[in-house]
């Protein structure tokens, strides 16, 4: 606040962080923040399996934290969703839990997981799309070019009534390190 600068908080994973971000936004501090699909969709309960695909930084947190992240998005304290896409080779993720690197892939499952979790919490499909598009663009100061007849466009067609199951065959990344499959 003193410098009138801005700060972006990536990978928010705890209720305490959401509370602090909310507090400073109310004070007028130029703070933006993001959450990851895995932090709004998974909890520390997945860690009991010692599956290295669930080893991320920051780590998966409690159900209380997960619900606070969702509330933070819906109320506007959190600005966007970012995948934290972190592919690792099979050999790296087959190491024991302590020595395996942190990270999981996230691009292919990001929207499906986020949409499922957030629409159950009351968000619209349109709002979920905005958290992946307009939210990051606003943080970066980028203009989103409106859809206009005769002009180039970046679009995605989403039928939220179609059931989709994330499978290993959908993965186009360097590795398959995802707890979602």
What role is predicted for each listed range?
Residues 21-22, 93-95, 169-170:
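Short amphipathic alpha-helical segments
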Residues 1-4, 53, 72-75, 79-81, ...:
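His/Asp/Glu-enriched, well-ordered alpha-helical/loop segment
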Residues 17-18, 41, 89-91, 166:
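Glycine/Thr-rich phosphate-binding loops of Rossmann-like dinucleotide-binding domains
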Residues 54-65, 101-105, 177-181:
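A short acidic, glycine-rich active-site loop
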Residues 14, 37, 87, 162-163:
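Short, glycine/acidic-enriched loop or turn micro-motifs at the edges of active sites
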Residues 1-81:
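Histidine/acidic residue-rich metal-binding segments in metalloenzymes
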Residues 63, 137-141, 174-175:
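Short gly/ser/thr-rich secondary-structure transition/capping motifs
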Residues 99, 152-181:
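C-terminal cap of metal-dependent C-N hydrolases
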């Amino acid at each position: 606040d003193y410098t009138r600068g801005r700060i972006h908080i990536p990978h928010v994973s705890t209720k305490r962080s959401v509370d602090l971000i909310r507090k400073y936004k109310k004070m007028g501090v130029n703070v933006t923040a993001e959450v990851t699909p895995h932090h709004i969709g998974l909890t520390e309960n997945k860690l009991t399996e010692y599956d290295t695909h669930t080893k991320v930084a920051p780590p998966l947190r409690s159900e209380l934290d997960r619900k606070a992240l969702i509330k933070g998005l819906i109320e506007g304290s959190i600005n966007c969703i970012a995948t934290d896409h972190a592919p690792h080779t099979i050999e790296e993720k087959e190491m024991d839990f302590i020595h395996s690197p942190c990270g999981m892939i996230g691009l292919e499952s990001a929207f499906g997981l986020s949409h499922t979790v957030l629409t159950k919490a009351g968000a619209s499909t349109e709002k979920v799309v905005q958290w992946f598009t307009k939210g990051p663009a606003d943080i970066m100061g980028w203009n989103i070019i409106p859809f206009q007849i005769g002009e180039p466009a970046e679009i995605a067609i989403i039928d939220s009534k179609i059931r989709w199951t994330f499978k290993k065959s959908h993965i186009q990344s360097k590795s398959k390190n995802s707890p979602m499959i």
